[in-house]
Amino acid sequence: MNKIKVFKKNFFFEKIKNKKNNIEIKKSTNDSTSNTCTDIKNNIIIENKINEENIENNNNINIGNNSVNNNNINNNNNSINNNNNNNNKNKNKNNNSYIPMIQYSNIHCIDWSSLISVDKLDLGSSNIFLIATFLNNKCEYNQVLLKSSTTIVQEVYASVLESILKLPIPEMRLLEYSNDEYIQMSRSLLTISSKTNKSLYDYIKLELLKSFFLIMEYAPNGKSFKDLDYKEYFSGYGGEKKLNQLGQVIAFDIFCNNSDRLPLIWDNVSSHFSNILFYDIPNRNGWYISLMNSNVTCINNSSFTIGYRKYITRVKSILYALFKRPNIESNQIKKMRESISKSYKINLSSSCGISIQRGIIQGVQLIISRISISILSDTKEKLRHLVKVDSTTNAWKKGLDSIHLPFLSDLLDTMVLFY
């Protein structure tokens, strides 16, 4: 059953209930391309309204997202293994019929005591999510994704930028260990996992030490790249649009130096399109994919650093080839396509490469039109004051310090150069 939200037409954003010291990445109710930040006390809401000219100077930031579609929510291979047992709880004892099971994904007002199962979801490139399933007294199942990381700050920063660009990211919020809800979450996760899976229990115990968790919306029926029927998926209905959308994602990855997805600019990348879920049915904004995790990896901000110069040079090279001959497959795209074809024993034609190439061009144009140096700087400043208490290892501060704005600024200038 789809999650239903009611919006007021005259408001840009949903009214958000106070959730102390949380970060929420929320859907915008207005498709306006203008962007501005508004305050929500003790929260960071990710909305599609960011002001390029001036982001308000306070301790909160609002950024947006285009959440994945929850259409046709059914059990899939990623669902928990004991759903069949849970279904039996819905059996009507009087007539032996089953009460229809209702599934949804709501990251707010979670009753952690209603947790009935937790399992792992591996999206590649060492990114592990937890699928938490809750059962309320109305026989409704709520499923959310949980994720912690040693690079949580960089991931939140990337999600903010994705939201500004209206890329397809799930609704999410940040939960820090100083919040009482973190204790409730920890207790429930450890209690459930200790009864079913010792290795999972040990894994969760270690993850909880990282002090910050993302609670994310979960839309079932998504597939990882390696699980796709490539010929049917990319040559069938909407095939060209899907490839074009991948290109837009690649453009963002180039800007953020996010090497987790494919070997286009980066050396020795073993994964292809990791951290992306692919759907047969597009969401309400027309996206067939959902970006489950992104990162910003800034090279040292000295222009004299070898790695710094090498990366900027590679970006210039690929952008020059793409913008000079957009309808002819570049050598870089061809190399990427052949690498994917070899790894998965599939035949992606040069026309597929050109579709991806055109998507990259569109993505670059989008970045130039919606991202500015002031937004990059102000977003970092907002995140600096987001959490109430940093971890004992100062993970939040260290993450922020690793986001070198001169590097991102140079990449933005490089893209403008070829636009």
UniProtKB/Swiss-Prot annotation:
One of its GO terms (molecular function) is kinase activity. Keywords: Kinase, Transferase. CDD domains: AFK. Pfam families: Act-Frag_cataly (PF09192). Residues 73-94 are annotated as: Disordered. It comes from the Eukaryota. The keyword Nucleotide-binding does not apply. GO terms for biological process: sexual reproduction. Belongs to the protein kinase superfamily. AFK Ser/Thr protein kinase family. This is Putative actin-fragmin kinase DDB_G0279609.
